[in-house]
């Protein structure tokens, strides 16, 4: 049985607004990105999801019907870059520090994996026993246990991740 999100948290499909995306990356310890870079994330992605948090009502904010909507914040995100057929890259896995250690990253990752698994091409290939899709990510130290727990394995020594070092 799937674990439920803690009270006040909700999973949504889509991408955070560019400013929220940048702040969440920065606050979670990922590399800083510009607003211009963040604005093209939705068009350059295959799928994304995020988790929002709304604090429980208190006597103060119950007076104002819009209080909970105003207090809702996006606290976790992740996305998939891919072709929809066989090649997928998990990216931008981030959880706000104040909301870590609650299983939110696990919920985001499981939602991303399930989206890949349930896509028509992948589902058909998995059912027929055809070549499996290639799903990869770059695993920074804080996320490695999470990724291993969800079935990811190190590719070394067969292959190693590399990046272009810009001048």
Regions found by a protein language model. Give the residues of each.
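Conserved active-site alpha-helix within GNAT-family acetyltransferase domains
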Residues: 120-167
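Short amphipathic alpha-helix that is part of the acyltransferase structural core
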Residues: 1-36
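Residue-level recognition of the GNAT/N-acetyltransferase active site
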Residues: 96, 100, 140
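A conserved beta-strand-loop-helix scaffold within acyl/acetyltransferase catalytic domains
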Residues: 38-57, 64-69, 74-94
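Conserved acetyl-CoA pyrophosphate-binding loop and the N-cap/start of the following alpha-helix
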Residues: 99, 103-111
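Intrinsically disordered, low-complexity domain-flanking/linker segments in eukaryotic proteins
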Residues: 54-71, 114, 118-130
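Eukaryotic N-terminal low-complexity, Ser/Thr- and Lys/Arg-rich leader segments
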Residues: 1-8, 58-69, 167
């Amino acid at each position: 049985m799937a674990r439920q999100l803690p009270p006040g948290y909700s999973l949504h499909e889509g991408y955070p607004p560019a400013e929220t995306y940048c702040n969440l990356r920065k606050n979670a310890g990922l590399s800083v990105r510009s607003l211009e870079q963040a604005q093209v994330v939705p068009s350059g992605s295959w799928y994304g999801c995020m988790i929002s948090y709304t604090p429980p009502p208190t006597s103060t904010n119950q007076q104002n019907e819009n209080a909970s909507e105003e207090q809702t914040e996006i606290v976790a995100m992740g996305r998939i870059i891919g072709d929809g057929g066989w090649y997928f890259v998990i990216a931008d896995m981030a959880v706000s520090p104040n909301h870590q250690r609650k299983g939110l990253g696990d919920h985001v990752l499981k939602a991303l994996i399930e989206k890949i698994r349930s896509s028509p091409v992948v589902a058909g290939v998995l059912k027929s026993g055809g070549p499996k899709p290639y799903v990869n990510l770059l695993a920074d130290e804080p996320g490695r246990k999470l990724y291993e727990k969800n079935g990811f394995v190190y590719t070394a020594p067969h292959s190693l991740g590399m990046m272009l070092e810009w001048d």
